[in-house]
Amino acid sequence: MVAHAGGGTRGGPGGLTAQRGLTNGGADMARRRCEPVATSPTETRYFDSFDGTPIAWRELGEGRPVVLIHGYFSDAKTNWIRYGHAAKIAAKGFRVIMPDLRAHGSSDRPHDPAAYPKDALTRDGHALIAHLGLTDYDLGGYSLGARTTSRMLATGATPRRVIFSGMGLAGLTETSRRAGHFRNILSNLGKHVQGTPEWLAEAFLKTTGGDPVALLGILETFADTPIAAVKAIRQPALVVCGAEDEDNGSAPELAAALPHGEYVATPGGHMSAVVKPELGQAIADFLAR
């Protein structure tokens, strides 16, 4: 795949090299070249965001651009690539663009509080779209990615279609509850009772190699999207959520608040819905209409 809008590999946090995200060995590269486009993501690329923070992204497929943003504690690979969602979407003729949010994945993980102003993730999203020169595109995200999508829409983003996954109405309009939940998790690591939601979230944090200090900073970026702004979203919007997921409020209520919203329930809860094929299929079918 051709690199878009000058996106190149570059150094980043912790001694990132230009080879980060590339596979090693000629035999492996030959194998990748023989795979269908829809199963072979590009190497990780980087750009400097509005404040100079290096932000990583990957792409999969060719065609109409769709930007998909992952959830908190996660990254593009875990949320979109590992369980085949990006491949399903790319197979429908889409160029799936998947950033790692700041403090996540291969993006920079600054510890300076100044790196986490209100709506920083929103500004990163706008910066990525500008960097890639996108003018006709679709936009969506899972959980924190869906919240970031709502903030981008409230601050001028103009996608054709919108996806809110793992998200309910209260998760957009009342962010303080979730911020408090995650602040408790990150401030009491190693102390949560086994089997509780807090313990499960900490276990997920460990699997993704999350940086607790940087992730605490992310909580300072949260901003509510007023209900009036939600109701002003005029694009066709898919609200796709696990049938057992109420972590971010009611998904049916969110769909009802959107002028052109539709709700699709998939199997699972907030954590488990991501591993189910129905999530990617619902998004692919919606975008391909």
Where do the model's predicted regions map?
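Conserved loop-alpha-helix segment in the C-terminal half of the alpha/beta-hydrolase fold
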Residues: 241-269
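Short beta-strand immediately N-terminal to the catalytic nucleophile in serine-hydrolase-like folds
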Residues: 139-141, 165
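Conserved HGGG/HGGXW glycine-rich cap/lid loop of the alpha/beta-hydrolase fold
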Residues: 50-108
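Flexible "cap/lid" loop of the alpha/beta hydrolase fold
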Residues: 147-190
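Hydrophobic, aromatic-rich cap/lid helix
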Residues: 202-226
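Catalytic histidine-centered segment of alpha/beta-hydrolase-like enzymes
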Residues: 269-280
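Short beta-strand/loop motif that positions the catalytic acidic residue
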Residues: 233, 239-241
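Active-site loop/oxyanion-hole signature of alpha/beta-hydrolase fold enzymes
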Residues: 88-91, 98-137
